């Protein structure tokens, strides 16, 4: 019997999210470069693969086979057989590959247990000169992802880049209010000297502001 949540591969992140990644919903992780976003995506993917399911992984920033192998360990080769990797080169391809992913959700060799997009907004940056049209396209991509999550009863995990919101005088995730609204849970990752901090920014049943500190290790993360 399915549980309503899927493990991130980290007890600390699972606890922060009230038990793991929620099915039929988008969970967003945002933060500066090298804050641990991709590591968490790979950990969640490996945890799902180890549970016997497949993973659809859309990577716009260059998938690291070495990092996947470090986290997956000695069974990396076997697990990789059920990792469906898409690597779009531009924003239009990103939309096409999101649509293509549904074929795997319908007909994969093993049931797909997780869809990851790392990052949802890297290619969006190249479209910013289009103004509102860029936002419209990004919203369409996210609505399609949310539709897949609901239709196939899986969690979707996305990462997001950051910018300085001058009007609010704070660091925020790209994509505006549309991306924030479509994400049911949002975690911000911050660098703190040699460590990192994960802070809950949005959740339907957990208080905003919950946090813990961690370091990035060869095989994933370690809480401190």
UniProtKB/Swiss-Prot annotation:
GO molecular function: ATP binding; ATP hydrolysis activity; ATP-dependent DNA damage sensor activity; damaged DNA binding
Keywords: ATP-binding, DNA damage, DNA recombination, DNA-binding, Nucleotide-binding
Pfam families xrefs: Rad51
Xref: InterPro entries: AAA+_ATPase (IPR003593), DNA_recomb/repair_Rad51_C (IPR013632), DNA_repair_and_recomb_RadB (IPR011939), P-loop_NTPase (IPR027417), RecA_ATP-bd (IPR020588)
GO BP, one annotated term: DNA repair
Family membership noted in the UniProt record: Belongs to the eukaryotic RecA-like protein family. RadB subfamily.
Its biological purpose: Involved in DNA repair and in homologous recombination. May regulate the cleavage reactions of the branch-structured DNA. Has a very weak ATPase activity that is not stimulated by DNA. Binds DNA but does not promote DNA strands exchange.
Protein name: DNA repair and recombination protein RadB
Gene: radB
């Amino acid at each position: 019997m399915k549980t309503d949540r899927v493990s991130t591969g980290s007890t600390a992140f699972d606890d922060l999210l009230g038990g793991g990644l929620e099915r039929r919903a988008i969970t967003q992780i945002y933060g500066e470069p090298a804050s641990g976003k991709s590591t968490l995506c790979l950990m969640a993917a490996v945890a799902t693969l180890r549970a016997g399911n497949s993973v659809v992984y859309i990577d716009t920033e260059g998938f690291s086979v070495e990092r996947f192998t470090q986290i997956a360990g000695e069974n990396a080769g076997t697990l990789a057989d059920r990792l469906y990797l898409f690597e779009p080169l531009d924003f239009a391809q990103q939309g096409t590959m999101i649509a293509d992913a549904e074929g795997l959700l319908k007909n994969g060799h093993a049931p797909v247990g997780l869809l990851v997009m790392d990052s949802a907004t890297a290619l969006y940056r190249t479209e910013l000169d289009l103004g509102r049209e860029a936002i419209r396209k990004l919203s369409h991509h996210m609505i399609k992802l949310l539709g897949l999550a609901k239709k196939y009863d899986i969690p979707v995990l996305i990462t997001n880049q950051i910018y300085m919101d001058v009007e609010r005088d704070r660091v925020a995730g790209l994509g505006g209010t549309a991306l924030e609204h479509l994400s049911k849970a949002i975690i911000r990752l911050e660098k703190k000297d040699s460590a990192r901090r994960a802070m809950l920014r949005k959740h339907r049943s957990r208080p905003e502001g919950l946090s813990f500190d961690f370091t990035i290790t060869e095989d994933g993360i370690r809480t401190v």
